[in-house]
Amino acid sequence: MTIAEIQQEILRMKKEQDVCILAHAYQGQEILEVADYMGDSYGLSVQASKSKCSGVIMCGVRFMAETCKILSPDKKVWLPNPAAGCPMAEQLDLEGLRTLKAEYPDYTVVAYINTTSELKTECDVCVTSSSAVEICSHLENDKILFIPDPNLGRYVAEQLPEKNFAFYKGGCPRHIVVSAKDVEKARADHPDALLLVHPECRQEVVEISTSISPLIKSTIIFSSSRFSI
């Protein structure tokens, strides 16, 4: 079967089985074309909770499907590839979290949404990259243990100097390989492009970015027609 034929079959079965298809923005074009909703992990889970469909197919990784199920407990949630995992979400296990909590007993544990459901059960609050600063600013406790991404955690800490942060030594393997030298090369190659950076990148990269707002939102906010991401 061709890609187009497979897509048509997916659309037919989707309607027949009363499911909606959620696709993370990182998915390939052939997946995005059959999806009902495209976005980030939390945004997709919210869309699933609002959907009238009885089931959801999450085209993403395991923690995304888990988050979807948490927000839509009455819906059936399928993960097309059960082996699809997020290295950052899986680098800290429950035993490791309990060890950290023992080291920082007076700290409020803030978990990035990119964590397993198992870890979420023993954390105090869960945040997204766009909500982390606001939520942490309203915590009564000034001591915050941020897991699992130290880069996002440090970005939040810089916005909230009145808080005392501790971090887990983790990070996204894809984002941490981007260096300041890579950024300078991109700027040299595309001098008229605005630089958009995700806060999971290293501090040296975040500091020289044009924007760290949600990437898709940034392309709408700024008038530029060229972006380096």
Regions found by a protein language model. Give the residues of each.
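Active-site loop-to-helix "anion-binding N-cap" substructures in soluble metabolic enzymes
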Residues: 1-222, 226-229
